Structure formats: structure tokens, C-alpha cells
Curated annotation (Swiss-Prot):
HAMAP family: LuxS. It catalyses: S-(5-deoxy-D-ribos-5-yl)-L-homocysteine = (S)-4,5-dihydroxypentane-2,3-dione + L-homocysteine. It holds the Pfam family LuxS. Homodimer. Binds 1 Fe cation per subunit. Its cofactor is Fe cation. It comes from the Bacteria. Belongs to the LuxS family. This is S-ribosylhomocysteine lyase. GO terms for molecular function: iron ion binding; S-ribosylhomocysteine lyase activity. Involved in the synthesis of autoinducer 2 (AI-2) which is secreted by bacteria and is used to communicate both the cell density and the metabolic potential of the environment. The regulation of gene expression in response to changes in cell density is called quorum sensing. Catalyzes the transformation of S-ribosylhomocysteine (RHC) to homocysteine (HC) and 4,5-dihydroxy-2,3-pentadione (DPD). The keyword Ubl conjugation does not apply. It comes from Yersinia pestis. GO terms for biological process: L-methionine salvage from S-adenosylmethionine; quorum sensing.
Length: 171
């Protein structure tokens, strides 16, 4: 099995909250695709609660588009990581990390402005696979934590696992 890019960085020294360019690629038609690691929690030390991350998934996708789309950028998808420590965001374009961090903070401020659980988008059995598993309170707690701690930038060259470590891990 090929080694995925996300497993070549050292999660023991990864900072959070932080933005990291996880991958860049060019389509056959020349479009630039960038995948960002939006790390909400320090790996193996913190985790987002399942109801909170699910609610955040519904809110974050729209709010990030409000603040980041335009000027050569269009978000394709924002999805939570299985480990519940962050989200991956795939987009067309190559915005710098600070632009992404600023949009992320603005989106978190928007989450804090949601006044009622009934205002969560697509919160019904037709549009959500587990529509009972939501918590606006938990999502807002996550958003407040991001704003209180601020968002930094994780650089791949600082997080790269040495080849010796990858060999030791039998990868």
C-alpha cells in the first residue's frame, strides 16, 4: 500500500490549532488543487466530541466558503478527519496559509453567532445521515477554543518524519 502524505509528518510535534498544506497537485487541465490540514486539536492529546465535530461539519463548510471563496479560490470539500483532531479542506487554487487561517477564524466567529440548533444547515433525516447526532453547544465550544488559542501555521519541513524513522516503523 502506498504511503499517504498525511502519514509522513510527525504527529508528536504537530501544533494546534494550525493550518498546513497537506498536498498540492495539478489536474490534467492545469487547475491547481490544494489540500489543507486544518488541525483543531493536538494529535493524541485532544479530540473533538462527536456531536460537536458533526455540527461543525455542517456549519464550517458554508462559513469557510463565505470567507475564502473568490480571487482564484473555490472550496471543493471540507471533511472531518477520522481521528477527530481536524478537517481536511480541498480546494481549487493556492491561497497562502495565512489567508486560510484568517478565513478559519472568521468562520469560527460565525459559528458563535448561530443562535439555535434549528439553524444548523441540512439538519434533517433527508440531508444528514445521523441527524440526531448534533450539538450546537459543543460546536460553539470548539469554535471558542480555536479563537482563544489562535491559529498558527504548521510547516511540512518542520514536521517531516526522517527516513530512518519511517524505516523503523516498517513503512
Amino acid at each position: 500500500m502506498p504511503l499517504l502524505d498525511s502519514f509522513t509528518v510527525d504527529h508528536t510535534i504537530m501544533k494546534a490549532p494550525a493550518v498546513r498544506v497537506a498536498k498540492t497537485m495539478k489536474t490534467p487541465h492545469g487547475d491547481e488543487i490544494t489540500v489543507f490540514d486544518l488541525r483543531f486539536c493536538v494529535p493524541n492529546k485532544e479530540v473533538m466530541p462527536e456531536k460537536g465535530i458533526h455540527t461543525l461539519e455542517h456549519l464550517f463548510a458554508g462559513f469557510m466558503r463565505d470567507h475564502l471563496n473568490g480571487d482564484g479560490v473555490e472550496i471543493i470539500d471540507i471533511s472531518p478527519m477520522g481521528c477527530r483532531t481536524g478537517f481536511y479542506m480541498s480546494l481549487i487554487g493556492t491561497p497562502d496559509e495565512q489567508r486560510v487561517a484568517d478565513a478559519w477564524k472568521a468562520a469560527m466567529a460565525d459559528v458563535l453567532k448561530v443562535t439555535d440548533q434549528r439553524k444548523i444547515p441540512e439538519l434533517n433525516e433527508y440531508q444528514c445521515g445521523t441527524y440526531h447526532m448534533h450539538s450546537l453547544e459543543e460546536a460553539q465550544s470548539i469554535a471558542k477554543d480555536i479563537l482563544d488559542r489562535d491559529v498558527r501555521i504548521n510547516h511540512n519541513e518542520e514536521l517531516a518524519l526522517p527516513k530512518e524513522k519511517l524505516t523503523e516503523l516498517h513503512i
